[in-house]
Amino acid sequence: TRLQGDWSSDVCSSDLVYKNEEITMPRAATFLKSTDRNERELIYQLIVNRREKDTVALDELFDLLRDLRHSVSLNAGYTNYRDYMFDALGRFDYSVSDCEDFHESIRTEILPITKGFMEERKERLQLDRLRPWDTEVDISGKPALKPFHGARELVDRSIRSMARVQPYFGECIRIMEQMGHLDLESKDGKAPGGYNYPLYEIGVPFIFMNAVDSQRDLVTMVHEGGHAVHSFLTRDLELTAFKGTPSEVAELASMSMELLSMDAWDEFYTNAEELKRARKDQLEKILSILPWIATVDKFQHWLYVNPKHSSAERAAAWMQIQDEFSTHTVDYSGYEHSRKSAWQKQLHIYEVPFYYIEYGMAQLGAIAIWRNYKKDPANAVKAYTEALKLGYTKSIPEIYETAGIRFNFSRGYVKELADFVKSELEKLND
């Protein structure tokens, strides 16, 4: 645990100096959205240079963690840490080969679509070459979306939009507000992040976040709202263990709410063009994250079934896997070294090994629920609600089946979901 925490210590202390001011890495990253390309390039250089200072230390830290984890797995009677962790994480409903199917399906069915996003970006920004500091700026050249002003508007508009999906969903947030269970606005000295915290004794959860009136905050609120609804729906289950669901199920609740609420985002945006921008941004993001999830997961499999690897072999394996899931649309000339150590920025590899693919599995499930909703809203919401009520009293595939979807990572099924999102994006582009 102490070694795992060393990653956070190194990364959290990695401030850099910009315009004579010391700023954190997360704050520095916000400048990558600047419409000034020279500023973006400068901040990217500063971030890369600062990360490079930690590369050797983080490499050595991982060597220690890998050796320790391998020893733990041998002592427990396993041949490698991957197999040990599959059992430790309670992955009884899917296997290593299912994860490999997920990797392959993302590579073949999702990657071509995300490549199209990057090619559109290059064209809209009118660039000869897309560089690594060009991937975050809004391609419309318009100011950042502002869906609300202050926590009061965020709460009211979230309640209205979620209630339009199902009145009970909005009522859950209303009860939390009345009980003082919402702490939403960013304040000086407030801890970072956002989460829904279940309170099993009373059955009414608590939402914490750091809202700054952004589109991302809207998504965070309905995401955590999905977790909150899940908490309400499982409050009467007999055992606490039934209420604590695995991430493959918990994130299905929250990621689905992001998409189910999207038709009601006109509660946040009265301007039709802004509403379209917000929806397009959401759909592109949910697909674009999937190749990165597959990259990180496949890399972790390699790390632990090859426990004697050297630092150089690790870097080579990372580059090979990264290339498998790359759109090859960004020109990294002069910054190849930053790609070689990019895995070091992923907290999960250091602190919660093998925990990451669950987000990808749940995202595919959420897309399937949304597809059902677009065909038959009433029945889709009913099935979603019934699935959440189960808590963890059924297996993951049974919960997905109750929701009217499949726990499936085959190329054919993933292609169906990808084509559906693509068709919805095309409607927004009309």
Predicted regions and their residues:
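Single conserved hydrophobic/aromatic residue that forms the stacking wall/gate
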Residues: 1-11
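C-terminal, non-catalytic "cap/extension" segments appended to globular domains
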Residues: 221, 229, 256-259, 267, ...
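Switch/coupling subdomain of P-loop NTPase systems
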Residues: 42-56
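Short beta-alpha connecting loops at secondary-structure transitions
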Residues: 206-210, 237-247, 276-285, 303-304
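Post-HExxH zinc-binding segment in Zn-dependent metallohydrolases
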Residues: 108-109, 245-274, 281-284, 288, ...
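Short alpha-helical catalytic segment bearing the HExxH-like zincin motif
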Residues: 213-224
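Active-site-proximal, well-structured secondary-structure segments within enzyme catalytic domains
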Residues: 20-34, 41-42, 63-208, 279, ...
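Catalytic Zn2+-binding segment of zinc metalloproteases
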Residues: 226-240, 260
